């Protein structure tokens, strides 16, 4: 994912005598200031002000990833009521979570004095627009459908009765024993029969049709062309040769994951999710706009869904000959509102000018490391150490903190019995990492943990070792800035034509800190030629790893390494301070607002509250919360935010 999901919590900062750029000092300060407004629950659009503490902490709880890999959205419905305790108890549980300093995030680049603000008081305060490789920014600004002589007419969608559609859907999905469905043509004409044929093939992929005479009446007979394998296979359906095979469209969504939206579309269209492609997934708790491509589904069918879709819309349709690929984007453009800010105009000006001119440290954000007392990087380290008993224990053992009730029971059963089958019975949903590992242990036995672990999807397994690489990188970058500041020095690394080279003494004046990269550890990278290079080695030795041998006996877990810029300077940085009285009102118009002609509420010139509206563009794999952290000078971890907020509200 290019961006990091952040909970809707007040980012108050402790009082500080100066702008010392070190988060460790900020951490030690005592918080006494109380916020002026409450926050809304993660599931509501409206801001809740009557019960700010409960709302604030429930919102943070809704954003918790319940286990190392994060579960699929539908699993949230299984959360048990025993977790709905008072906010104080949830805050106490979150004391066991991670803070930024736990994962090496300790430095700032600017010396300005930080200030308070509330991020995502409304999910509409965080808007992401995808930027394609050619620089085009995705916007939803057109609901029209491309004109195509071979597109089905509007009558295609109304010619079938609800009863006919139900029978056809059951036939399509093999839900009954019928091998065909007969639909009588009431007003018989060739044109009417053509429309019915077209409607069935368009709305129910995998079905074929023919016309039959029965007792002097005309019937359209729908049947399966080639058994179950033909179900929803768009490659088997007729498609005009002159039209591109992929319909590209803009997906505008509110408070919904990208995959959730695609799964909803798949169900409506009766197709498999894998015929959709995209360049990246976007946050849930935000408004996001991105391009999607789908194989052999007409724009008209997609546009027709806008009548029934909740929290997302489709538009800007076009036909092309290619799908989309993950990572094929230039980045994302963010529009962020920080509400109830306390900074002076001078503080805000200094912070934003620094962001525009210098940038921020390109740390891997908190979501890279999970939110429980067992960070994902620890599991990654155990994998690299080939310590499979430790891997199993870290994933399955009980841990303090906020988790779903059934996971707690599963872990307790595992700790008590070490019986994978018994522990698995405690999980109503088996697709989480814990469930997959337990299934693997049941199948392969406790003496073959490697094979059992291999049942977990590859991307999830690799997430752990990538988390460890990120952990090392964050720590080394903090040490690099601590020891050498924000200037390029001899021995630093830069990229020339994609190849890393060291900066030499006689060449150092040709480079700035914005050119410097640092390696993620691996067998195919080089390290700085100053004491930070030695620090990498020392850190890995302390973790029982050999920096000169990052190949693993299991090929998937061999780390080739990579390079990452240590400072990112956002593009298209703009900001303004907006006064407002009502925390529930929007402070800018979204794409959908503009399409629907909704005017912005009239804002006061001198309101009770002030908000900072900021815009900036970032490259892929860069964390927007790290840019916001630099502006506010605040720890972005859920643990820190939750503890700070309960302190203010006491």
PLM feature spans:
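Non-catalytic, substrate/partner-engaging modules appended to enzymatic cores
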Residues: 2-650
């Amino acid at each position: 994912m290019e961006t990091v999901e952040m909970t809707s919590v007040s980012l108050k900062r402790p009082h500080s005598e100066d702008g010392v750029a070190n988060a460790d000092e900020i951490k030690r300060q005592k918080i006494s200031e109380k916020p002026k407004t409450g926050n809304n629950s993660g599931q509501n659009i409206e801001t809740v002000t009557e019960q700010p503490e409960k709302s604030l902490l429930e919102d943070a709880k809704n954003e918790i990833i319940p286990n190392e890999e994060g579960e699929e959205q539908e699993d949230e419905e299984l959360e048990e009521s025993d977790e709905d305790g008072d906010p104080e108890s949830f805050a106490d549980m979150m004391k066991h979570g991670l803070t930024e300093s736990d994962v090496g995030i300790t430095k700032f680049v600017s010396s300005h004095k930080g200030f308070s603000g509330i991020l995502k008081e409304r999910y509409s305060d965080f808007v992401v627009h995808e930027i394609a490789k050619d620089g085009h920014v995705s916007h939803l600004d057109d609901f029209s459908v491309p004109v195509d002589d071979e597109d089905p007419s509007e009558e295609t969608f109304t010619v079938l009765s609800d009863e006919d559609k139900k029978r056809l859907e059951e036939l399509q999905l093999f839900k009954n024993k019928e091998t065909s469905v007969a639909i009588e043509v009431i007003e018989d004409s060739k044109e009417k029969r053509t429309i019915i044929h077209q409607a069935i093939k368009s709305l129910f992929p995998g079905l074929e049709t023919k016309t039959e005479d029965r007792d002097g009446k005309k019937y359209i007979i729908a049947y399966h062309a080639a058994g179950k394998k033909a179900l929803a296979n768009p490659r088997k359906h007729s498609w005009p040769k002159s039209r591109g095979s992929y319909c590209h469209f803009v997906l505008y969504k509110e408070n919904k994951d990208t995959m959730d939206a695609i799964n909803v579309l798949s169900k409506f269209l009766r197709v498999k999710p894998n015929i959709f492609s995209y360049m990246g997934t976007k946050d849930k708790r935000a408004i996001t706009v991105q391009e999607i491509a789908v194989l052999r589904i007409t724009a008209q069918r997609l546009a027709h869904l806008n009548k029934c879709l909740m929290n997302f819309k489709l538009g800007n349709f076009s036909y092309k000959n290619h799908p989309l690929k993950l990572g094929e984007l230039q980045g994302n453009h963010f529009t962020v509102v920080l509400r109830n800010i306390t900074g002076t105009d001078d503080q805000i000006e200094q912070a934003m000018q620094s962001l525009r001119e210098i940038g921020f440290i390109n740390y891997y954000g908190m979501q890279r490391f999970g939110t429980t007392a067992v960070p994902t990087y620890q599991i990654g380290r155990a994998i690299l150490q080939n310590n499979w008993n430790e891997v199993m224990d870290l994933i399955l053992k009980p841990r303090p903190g906020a988790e779903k009730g059934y996971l707690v029971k599963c872990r307790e059963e595992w700790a008590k019995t070490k019986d994978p089958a018994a522990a698995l019975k405690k999980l109503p949903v088996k697709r989480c990492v814990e469930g997959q590992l337990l299934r693997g242990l049941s199948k392969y036995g406790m003496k073959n943990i490697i094979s059992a672990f291999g049942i977990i999807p590859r991307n999830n397994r690799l997430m752990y070792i990538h988390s460890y690489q990120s952990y090392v990188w964050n720590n080394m970058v903090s040490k690099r800035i601590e020891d050498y500041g924000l200037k390029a020095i001899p021995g630093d690394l830069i990229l020339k034509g994609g190849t890393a080279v060291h900066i030499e003494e006689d060449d150092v004046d040709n480079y700035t800190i914005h050119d410097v990269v640092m390696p993620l550890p691996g067998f195919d990278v080089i390290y700085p030629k100053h004491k930070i290079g030695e620090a990498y080695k020392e850190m890995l030795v302390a973790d029982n790893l050999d920096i000169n041998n990052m190949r693993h006996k299991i090929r998937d877990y061999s780390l080739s390494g990579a390079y990452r810029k240590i400072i990112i300077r956002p593009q298209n940085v703009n900001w303004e301070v907006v006064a407002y009285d009502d925390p529930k009102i929007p402070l800018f118009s979204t794409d959908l607002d503009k399409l629907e002609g909704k005017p912005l509420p009239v804002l006061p010139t001198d309101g009770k509250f002030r908000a900072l509206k900021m815009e900036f563009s970032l490259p892929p794999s860069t964390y927007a919360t790290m840019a916001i952290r630099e502006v506010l000078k605040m720890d972005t971890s859920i643990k820190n935010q939750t503890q700070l907020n309960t302190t203010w509200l006491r």
